[in-house]
Amino acid sequence: MVLRDEILVRHVDRVPPATGRNNGHRSRPPAGTAPSTMRAAIDALAERRAVALAPADAAADRRHRAQGKLDPRSRLERLLDAGSFTEIGLFAEHRAVGFGMEDSHPAGDGVITGWGTIDGRTVFVFAHDARVRGGALGAVYARKLHQLLDLADSCGAPVIGLNDGGGARIQEGIDALAGFGGLFARNVRASGVVPQLSVILGSCAGGAVYSPALTDFTFMVEGIGNMFITGPDVVREVTGEQVSREELGGARRHADTTGVAAFVAADEQSCFDEVRDLLSYLPSNNQELPPRQWSGDPADRRCEALCDIVPIDDRVPYDMRRVVAEIVDDGEYLEVHESWARNIICALARLDGNVVGIVGNQPAVLAGVLDIDASEKAARFVRMCDSFNIPLVTMVDVPGFLPGVEQEHAAIIRRGAKLLYAYCEATVPRIQIIVRKAFGGAYIVMDSKSIGADLSFAWPSNRTAVMGAEAAANIIFRKQIAAAADPVRRRQELVREYERDLMNPFVAAQRGHVDDIIDPADTRSVLIRSLALLAAKRAAGPVRKHGNIPL
């Protein structure tokens, strides 16, 4: 048996000295004499494949590993089911000339493409190889990605991209730029058709950032993943600002501040585990339902702890995540954008084994108020769920939209409308649960019946109104309070009157805006029965090209 290293040495020995620069990349082996038998042809193929699979640049490989990063093939092995990967495009090579390009033709051209399985389900994958010209994209590299996305679109399977590259290959000029354009167009065409996941495992700079930005979910690994359109050197040259790569576009920055990263992991293996976990909640394409996984958690299980988790006084905060955990199967859920816009929660979970998307105000952060970031975070999540046939459950405890000059000038009118638009357009089953306060326009936006929720239920702690009693009293009873002999006492009386007449738990139900007032302990069983009913829901919108969402 011939060892792979022996094959590699044999081929390297055959290669004549290259002329010009080769940047340390191993040149392709010469074609040689045509094999005389099939067996000889198979042996030649094995030798050629061994060379193609070996690192093209030993020095670049050492530098890559010194950063604590896995090589791209090891990444695919850890992400996919064992032995499931099938590669295409292994022998693809660039055809560029000039700038020393003709002296080096690494097999694969810097990107690995193919398909495999995760939990037995087909996925298409690509992995940038940062050891080949920094992972920069050229024309052939791009063509491999185009083919992969076309196959995923045709076969109806998710696409996972392991990103570790430096943008367009400068030496290939406009051909590289056109390659990115073709990639972006395919990302958009596949949007809402098959799940697209981007994993940032190194640099993702310049035009390269827009492909992950167009996909459904972006994962980043702390310490090695970073994303920016212009790097620290350009920022310093143009603006004079001093900033590190991590501060400018590191994983924590995009998870906490920009919302670009939906998930952040401490290391690559943890990241791959999260990718696999997320896929377990998603269908392979928009014509399928998410996979059902029944855990044995009884559908009629009462959630008695909810009465202790949620205080009756709507001024007292609590953690909505505890409410979600109490209701869903086995208390398990996957939160999306956990550290961005923390005043709203977006999570994937299961009820009676069926996947649901949960949107909930978070009273523990900013009292659960809706602001720009919360609106955009929830809007994107709602649209993702609607794209992939995931029913929506909305847990409401909202005092309104966040007031202030900063929010108004940052366009909360337009950007807050995104959540309203997303809910109104969604055709999946939609159920609203009013936990406590539901005030003003924010109540409407949080999937009220008036904008199309299929069913609305409220707890006896609900207080639904245009605004809270204290604020309302200052407006509608202003003259009466001012004319009173004891304004403080009169104001308190009028506040209680407002609460009695307009904020009692039964007003919304009496007027048909809520379908029932339920015991909080029955929330799980009510949701499961309602979702079973709505599984047969059919909804068709008007004939149109597309709506004009307030982007």
Residues covered by each model-derived region:
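Ligand-binding clefts of soluble mixed alpha/beta catalytic domains
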Residues: 2-551
